[in-house]
């Protein structure tokens, strides 16, 4: 099993419920164990699309036997099951799931970058990672 940190975010619909539903779907996968979830933080949207609702964000510490691409496929499947429609980059979404850190892996492919390249630009992600690291 590999220690992984997942970013979760939502700014459409019942944001809290969307995040908890995504966590429930993660827990239903026998190859994923959700260890801990950070405090939910309300944040301004990032990126060029400014006229959209506030986000609710969290970071989850998980362990998985899935390799990075398999985990990414599971996250995309959960987003799809929860009704996410990808219309515009940086636009509003009912759920967003990102692999932030996957063990000590470094991957730089068009569809997967680990560690997530925006960690340093997202204080809410840094706060969630610090919170979870403090509990270990």
Over which residues does each language-model region extend?
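N-terminal beta1-alpha1 ligand-phosphate binding loop
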Residues: 1-32, 37-44
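Solvent-exposed residues in well-ordered beta-strands and their adjoining turns
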Residues: 9, 63-65
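Flexible, gly/pro- and Lys/Arg-enriched active-site loops
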Residues: 14, 31, 46-55, 66-136
């Amino acid at each position: 099993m590999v220690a992984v940190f997942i970013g979760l975010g939502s700014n459409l619909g019942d944001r809290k419920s969307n995040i908890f539903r995504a966590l429930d779907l993660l827990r239903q996968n026998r190859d994923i164990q959700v260890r801990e979830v950070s405090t939910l933080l309300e944040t301004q949207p990032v990126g060029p699309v400014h006229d959209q609702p506030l986000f609710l964000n969290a970071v989850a510490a998980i362990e998985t036997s899935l390799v990075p691409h398999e985990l990414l496929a599971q996250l995309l499947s959960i987003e799809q099951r929860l009704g996410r429609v990808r219309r515009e980059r940086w636009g509003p979404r009912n759920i967003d799931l990102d692999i932030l850190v996957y063990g000590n892996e470094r991957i730089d492919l068009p569809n997967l970058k680990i560690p997530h390249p925006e960690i340093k630009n997202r204080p809410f992600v840094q706060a969630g990672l610090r919170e979870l690291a403090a509990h270990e």
